[in-house]
A protein has these predicted regions:
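Short, positively charged and aromatic/hydrophobic N-terminal segments
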Residues: 2-5, 10, 14-17, 27-31, ...
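Acidic/histidine-enriched alpha-helical segments
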Residues: 123, 179-203, 290-299, 396, ...
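M16 family metallopeptidases and their MPP-like homologs
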Residues: 75, 83-100, 120-175, 211-234, ...
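Short, polar/flexible loop-turn hinges at active-site or ligand-entry regions and domain interfaces
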Residues: 112-115, 157-160, 179-188
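A short, acidic, amphipathic alpha-helical segment used as a generic capping/interface helix at domain edges
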Residues: 458-465
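His/Glu-rich zincin catalytic helix
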Residues: 46-130, 235, 248-354, 395, ...
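Short, low-order "capping/linker" segments at domain edges
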Residues: 201-205, 303-315, 420-429
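Active-site glycine-rich loop that binds ribose-phosphate moieties when present
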Residues: 241-248
Length: 489
């Protein structure tokens, strides 16, 4: 349930005599729909959005959202009981053939800065902050590349001398991002070469992991004419070709053109206003001309593409890519998510119970909906000689759902599995930080509870309709050529 704490001055002009207006613990609140919420956010009228668990008056956690600059969002999540805090800066840019170049930026930034010229200096500073840790992540959200730098620490109330640990950790993070160590105006060549090797090793490890490799190859083939087909880390050749001059140019482009999300997840006692002011001070001289990018959704497949490769592994990898009939990320989302889960998202699903358990055709077999692109993947590990049987069985189970051959118990099991998964998001600051980061593309920052309520309203007829929108696009088979155990599968 979305409940917005609003400025009283806008009640009459924006809400009127809405029956949804009520008072809770001295706070005037109103239940609103998503369209009105988005309009109020744009007007800067919403102070806070609170989530109250269904049937309970106790506040679980609060979420504040503000736009503090051009395409710069500031999100704070506060919950009583957190013993640690997590703050992050995420930069979203269009996914292009320069993915390798941008993927290297978080690594080089967290290596040194003007104030902390070596890793040793940085580690000493983090040690004074009770062992705070810096982390980086590169992900793909739709046809966008998201570069994330984060810092995790103990909560302020555990500091021995009442220090503002979270704010000081954010200061270190901003120092790394906005004041990197340059020599003659560029990143140090030795440091760039070192980080290139590490990034190439990371990508190489993904190639060696055949389950990950097969999934990435499916996306590359299925979306060959779409930006989504590009690996979030780029290519080995792309990494090796990077120069320190090119990396410096890309870094400046990132600060200028990326959409930015500053997120802080902590105990309710942490003062986040000071963190916002600190960020604005560091970013004050940064020129901003943000570049917008919309993900292309392909609703259906006209033909099926089939590609087979071989590898020296025992277990074959069969990956099937489906188009979900979505025009955008919100197009019948709840029904399609439940459909994907009934199909292969949990131990009670069709793929698990029938294809894996009853027919014994797969070592593993599951489906996964990729909402940000409107596609669904089925990944399975099989004996290569069972390829045709496995493909047929997987498609047969999808047909069963299209015909409505599943029970209300199957539907309820999927809803319960998704509810449990979404509720676990609020278990830690890190999980909440990741949750809101995934929503950076459209600035539609909704709670896990919002989606749980969406799922509760999905009917069997909704799932049947969603299944009938699904079309098979691409099949990728990685055939094993080895009999021995022990390969990286």
């Amino acid at each position: 349930m979305l409940i917005c704490q609003l400025k009283m001055s806008i009640f009459k002009s924006k809400i009127g005599n809405n029956k949804g207006v009520f008072e809770r613990k001295g706070i005037f609140c109103v239940r609103i729909n998503k369209k009105l919420w988005k309009n109020l956010v744009k007007c800067g009228k919403i102070n806070r959005i609170n989530v109250f668990p269904s049937g309970s008056d106790s506040l679980k956690y609060t979420f504040d959202f503000k736009e503090i600059g051009e395409s710069i969002d500031f999100c704070t999540v506060k919950a009583e009981g957190f013993k640690t805090a997590c703050a992050s800066l995420s930069f979203m840019i269009p996914l292009t053939e320069n993915a390798s170049l941008f993927a290297l930026i978080p690594n080089i930034l967290t290596r040194s800065s003007e104030k902390y010229p070596t890793l040793t200096h940085l580690e000493k500073k983090l040690a004074t902050l009770y062992g705070a840790e810096i982390g980086v992540d590169v992900s793909k959200i739709g046809e966008n590349q998201v570069l994330k730098l984060s810092v995790c620490s103990i909560d302020d109330r555990f500091a021995l001398h009442n220090e503002k640990i979270v704010e000081e950790c954010c200061r270190v993070l901003f120092e790394l991002v906005f004041r990197p160590k340059f020599v003659d105006g560029v990143f140090l060549e030795d440091e760039v070469e070192s980080e290139k090797r590490l990034l190439a090793e990371q990508l190489g490890a993904e190639i060696s992991d055949k389950r990950v490799y097969a999934k990435n190859r499916l996306e590359e083939i299925m979306c060959a004419d779409e930006a989504y087909g590009i690996n979030r880390l780029g290519t080995i050749d792309g990494i090796n070709a990077i120069t320190n001059e090119e990396l410096t140019i890309a870094y400046k482009k990132l600060l200028k053109e990326a959409k930015v999300l500053l997120s802080v997840s902590a105990n309710g006692s942490v003062e986040t206003e000071g963190i916002k002011k600190l960020f604005l001070e560091y970013a004050e001289n940064t020129e901003r001309t943000p570049e917008k990018n919309e993900t292309l959704y392909v609703e259906s497949a006209e033909d099926v593409t089939y590609v087979k490769e071989t590898a020296p592994v025992k277990q074959g990898k069969l990956v099937m890519g489906f188009r979900l009939g979505m025009k955008d990320r919100n197009d019948d989302y709840a029904a399609k998510r439940i459909m994907s889960d009934v199909f292969g998202g949990n131990p009670n699903s069709k793929l698990f119970k029938v294809v894996r358990e009853e027919m014994s055709l797969c070592y593993y077999c599951s489906s996964r909906m990729l909402r940000a692109k409107g596609i669904m993947l089925v990944q399975s590990g099989i004996e290569s000689f069972n390829e045709e049987k496995a493909k047929t069985a997987i498609l047969d189970q999808l047909e069963e759902i299209k015909k409505g051959n599943f029970t209300e118990e199957d539907l309820d099991a999927s809803k319960k599995a998704l509810e449990d998964a979404f509720k676990s998001v609020s278990d830690s600051p890190e999980a909440l930080d990741s949750w809101f980061t995934t929503q950076i593309e459209h600035s539609e920052y909704l709670y896990p509870e919002d989606y749980i309520n969406m799922f509760k309203g999905v009917t069997k007829e909704d799932v049947i309709r969603a299944a009938n929108d699904v079309t098979l696009d691409t099949v990728f088979m990685l055939e094993g050529t080895e009999d021995e155990e022990g390969e990286n599968e």
